[in-house]
């Protein structure tokens, strides 16, 4: 007889968290894993995260990425991730004020699904991620 729990586990959302600040990437991962999400992978290096995503792109439901990072910013990361998997949901995080016109200029085609403004509470992060996953 098939194990029903095993089938359910296969459909749990897999989340990629990317922030060059190790403590923040780890904190977001812990927040998500504490309540809802079991499959959360955190990265501090955009190039390493992109390589991992390239290999495992079919498994991911959502990417949460900081915008301002060295070597590759969040907008560049999103463009590359969308080339690999156009259906993955994208949340960007920033501590800076960014208006809709700037988003449209910098990221005209590959839209994002939401924005997390830092600092954000655990509750805010969970609410935003849960809402985007359900869409």
Regions picked out by a protein language model, each given a short descriptive name:
Residues 76, 97-114, 123, 127:
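Alpha4 helix (beta4-alpha4-beta5 surface) of REC/receiver domains from two-component response regulators
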Residues 66:
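Active-site residues of response regulator receiver
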Residues 22-41:
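Two-component/phosphorelay signaling modules centered on CheY-like receiver
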Residues 93-95:
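Hydrophobic/aromatic residues positioned on beta-strands within the core alpha/beta folds
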Residues 45, 73-76:
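Acidic catalytic/metal-coordinating carboxylates
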Residues 42-62:
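Acidic, metal-coordinating helix/loop segments flanking the phosphotransfer/catalytic sites
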Residues 1-16, 26, 59, 121-135:
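Non-catalytic signal-transmission and effector/linker regions of two-component phosphorelay proteins
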Residues 69:
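Receiver (REC) domain active-site loop signature in two-component systems and cognate sites
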